[in-house]
């Protein structure tokens, strides 16, 4: 254990003693609640709310509130919270991550802090890993809250904004991290206050917190719209790289020359093109220099094509189904619908496989899960495996981790690892072990790391005549059924890593599923034959329960569930999750991992040292070794990978912190505009700042006689219908020498304010305020989108600054700040220009159309329902809005991959674009001329 982890655990005993005291306190008053009627129990909720309003803290109310929930759960669900569950609930309320083993009833624990914190009336969010669990928990645990008079909502995909608003309005809301995150982003793309759905971020309880806050933290949530991208290059480069050969890196010091056209580093998952490869590519493409700025995007296409060829393996990293490349999750082995790699990687794989290449998208709004969860005033979470990541929870989220004791002692026997020289020998031993255990009837769960390996093992088992079920990416329709029955006598289940988190494997089987299967066999359906189903269910359930009870005792005597891992995962946590499937609630169980030197983890780390040990010992292929040195090497390899992944996540956070501060400014500004704040004063400041900026650019050097005032006035005329002339200023100052920058500024500012008042008198104040609101929102959104694109581009190349002995992060912060300032100047300049140059007409009713690109004279259209005056800007006809908005988010247990899909039309926010002929403001053009980089193509 590292020194840091020891320090992290130093205060553990103190916290556990405090939690024990709370649990004892709740138990001591339990009897007071038993004799209350349902109505009296329900009335306590209002009493607690009043006491909170009168100044009592939630901590003061905790013992009574917890005792109330315990009694309600007994009456509604027939389940009483154990004392250890009370401890877990208290840990969550205090803002800790509670580590509770599989089968300890984490879902029931969530009801305690949810009820207590909902008494404040500010809302509680319970966050799960998928829609199925969110709906299941909100329905089941929601019964307890509803019984106590609280409202319960559930956010799932494809809900309309009105439905979402209603769910967020509830006291307690269940949903997935992606849904909560996207609603936050969409709220910050809304065009009127009426479109907002969330009501703040008060308290969140995150179920499977390690999966959501650790595994998924490297992948941001992104809302995007279609971008212009040439897909032909993907196909061209896919063909081209088949003619390039893989080689090794050179080393000048050792006199080793590089070989082949490119090299691949599997450990870091990177590729590098050699000089020979560059020469071939330049020759085939007919270009002089691949690394010229005009050819920059081609380097990205080339790197992706090589990665697709060398690092992404079919049937391990992805499968091709119906002409579509589907990513296989490396943790769970499941296909997640719509999941795609970003940065053009998915398109490169599509080109390699010769299927249709789908378009890339442009980012409209983005946030990492790390920063989203840091928005909450109080955050807590629960999981079966958190201690290995305690340092990360503390450093990034300021969350302590508390291991909650189990209700019954854990009696699972964790056997030591067996290591074989070859993979074939390892799988032969695995099959022997399974056949032996299966013969006596012990249920077995086998964990593999890929679809390919699960199918190979399945073939070997079939040859031996062992009946088994396969649970992998190609089988996930039957997932819940297979998992539920994996604890039955003689069951053999082969699972790609452990999919199906949130479903317990009960020894002897699951009576609910058995009863349902029995009724379906009789031809009944819960939807079509509601009454018959309801009538037949109790009897079927009773029969199933008796059968399960008898089988449970048999399986228990056989040693419980045997978990067999066929490979160590790069994260100890995933291994522990697989092990944790066995030995729930004090049941017996056993686990063992079989390894070989061909396993990915061993191949990438320490394999040579282990190979040496085996060679020296002269061990035959089919004889395993149990060697402490080898076991230590594996543990060291795992901690290296974990540390590497932690550093990556910390790095993502450091860079996102820069964008996060900018996001807070922009979203704060948007919210002020949406909430109807009078922008008149702000627009006056915009005008003054823009005029000052124009004048500063033209008068920064030389004397008045040398200034190009004609050019300056030309710029003013583009901005607004300027009335004051250079001659008038010269006359007022006496001569040209008397015309100072301050004098020009004062005169032009007075003029622009007069012109603006005149325009307001023509249109009317109400119309002008509404026009200001729409213009500022429109410009703000478009400039922010362009800024995100620029920041993306900046981050991609910033690592190269290290070669110039500069800190990439410091450079990113500095340049990001400059770009943000240029964007803010651009927002002011464009807003003023639009307010003067848009032709506006008032209409009784107007169709909802978004703002779109114009040329010299942009057009502004109404978007979103609002009670403000209905106006329409006359100008060029607006092009069509993009058909859809796209989303991209981390997968459940995903590393590197993303779930992608399209929002339903009523979920999407309008795309608002307008701009000058080259799409740049003067501020941005000046920045580009200085070499600060204007708009650039993204690699």
UniProtKB/Swiss-Prot annotation:
Keyword ATP-binding among record annotations: yes
A GO BP entry: protein targeting
Keywords: ATP-binding, Cell membrane, Cytoplasm, Membrane, Nucleotide-binding, Protein transport, Translocase, Translocation, Transport
UniProt-listed Gene3D superfamilies: Helical scaffold and wing domains of SecA, P-loop containing nucleotide triphosphate hydrolases, SecA, preprotein cross-linking domain
SMART domains documented for this protein: SecA_DEAD, SecA_PP_bind
Pfam families (alphabetical): P-loop_SecA, SecA_DEAD, SecA_PP_bind, SecA_SW
Subcellular location: Cell membrane; Cytoplasm
Domain of life: Bacteria
Molecular function per GO: ATP binding; protein-exporting ATPase activity
Function recorded in the entry: Part of the Sec protein translocase complex. Interacts with the SecYEG preprotein conducting channel. Has a central role in coupling the hydrolysis of ATP to the transfer of proteins into and across the cell membrane, serving as an ATP-driven molecular motor driving the stepwise translocation of polypeptide chains across the membrane.
Similarity annotation: Belongs to the SecA family.
Entry protein name: Protein translocase subunit SecA
